[in-house]
Amino acid sequence: YYFEDFKIESTFSEDSTRIIEINSPDIITGYMKGKFKVRELGRLVRNSIGSIYTNYKPFEISGGQEMSFNFKIYNKIVEVFFPQIDFGPNTFIRGNIIADEGDFKLNFKSPYISAYGNELDSIDFRIDNKNPLFNTYLTVQDVSTRYYDVKDFNLINTTLNDTLFFRTEFKGGSDYDDSYNLNFYHTFNPGNKSVIGLKKSDISFKGNTWVINRESNSQNKVIVNSTLDSITIEEIVMNNNNREQIRLKGQLADSTYKDLELQFKIVSLNKITPAIDSLNLKGEINGTLNVLQKDNIYLPVCNLDISQFSVNDIELGDLTIGVVGNRDLSEFSVNSQIK
């Protein structure tokens, strides 16, 4: 990579305010100014971000430090470190830190970000740890991925005691007919593992509303260890009306172990299958899907009963499906029967 100009200038004003100006039209332009020590700058920033958590233990730094910053980020510098990420023009980050008061404000905006085959348009991310209404706020106008598209994504967060509470809303699907209203939280348990819990939320898919954690209990959560290589899904439960239920639970450990179970209870087939032209599937599903992996050995098992099974309104009867895969998932034994 070739950069035409790169200039960094550090000066002090009459009141001992440090001013660091960076000017490179290919990399980054802007400034940071305030009363801060360069050797403590990393710890100062980490303390500011960590202040969102009330149980964060800050690094020791000198008192009286404060800083404001405003930078315009150009795509070439992003390409150097992350070749698969592309920032749009007029991407900027600005904010200020007052360390002694624990005050941290940040605003990041970009017209678009392309990353690993995914496209995000009109990103606006804000942090204000002293705001009584929200601590973090994120909006994304459009998200395009290879698997699912999203628009009007909004996420807001506030902190209570040692827990971050989030509310997010967005629409998804090929025609954006699916809607999501999710409430969740993040905290740490006594073992210093991350806990991501789902509070009562709802998802509308194919015109049907599913309620997550209808009972508002504390069991709907995922626990992640500090090295991010062990995940425990205690349970995630979705209900439609009073009868239908989908339940997920299991464990994952790096790439060598998985034990996942997906349960269906009186679930209408047409509510969970993707829309396919000229194909209309109906019936009620009961049963489980299991995937067990130990090292490179897999033991997938599926046992499903679909009552009143029909295709394009042609009733076929009650369908029973049993599937067992071999150890490397190269072959599957399928046993099905219609009565």
Regions found by a protein language model. Name each.
Residues Y1-K339:
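Interface amphipathic segments
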